[in-house]
Amino acid sequence: MTIDINAIREALPHRYPMLLVDRVLEVSEDEITAIKNVTINEPFFNGHFPQYPVMPGVLIMEALAQTAGVLELSKPENKGKLVFYAGMDKVKFKKQVVPGDQLVMTAKFVKRRGTIAVVEAKAEVDGKLAASGTLTFAIGS
């Protein structure tokens, strides 16, 4: 099942320039794969870096967090709720992400306790790992 930008906008509160998920390619109960098409028109490229544009690593992690957020907030029991980013661990950046790249982002929920969830996430470009880490979320109203 795919999820288009309209359904993503319905699930997430983020809007331009902070909406970093363009389309969901696959979704199951605890795993999601989505894409972000990275273009030179992204506002962060104006300062990071003007002569050598590179997507900031923290925004790659934010895109992964939003990907996981789409999975959680698309569930009927979480409609109208928010997902709060509570932390990230074991983050590694392996490849620069530049204009023209397509980030393929995967998030898999590995642990849940009450309103807290832990996700293993990774972002790839052309099948090569760009970033990975463990993300922690709190689900609230």
Curated annotation (Swiss-Prot):
Gene3D superfamilies: Hotdog Thioesterase (3.10.129.10). Keywords: Cytoplasm, Lipid A biosynthesis, Lipid biosynthesis, Lipid metabolism, Lyase. Pfam families: FabA (PF07977). One of its GO terms (cellular component) is cytoplasm. It catalyses: a (3R)-hydroxyacyl-[ACP] = a (2E)-enoyl-[ACP] + H2O. The active site is at H48. It is found in: Cytoplasm. PANTHER family: 3-HYDROXYACYL-[ACYL-CARRIER-PROTEIN] DEHYDRATASE. Belongs to the thioester dehydratase family. FabZ subfamily. This is 3-hydroxyacyl-[acyl-carrier-protein] dehydratase FabZ. The lineage of its organism: Bacteria, Bacillati, Bacillota, Bacilli, Lactobacillales.
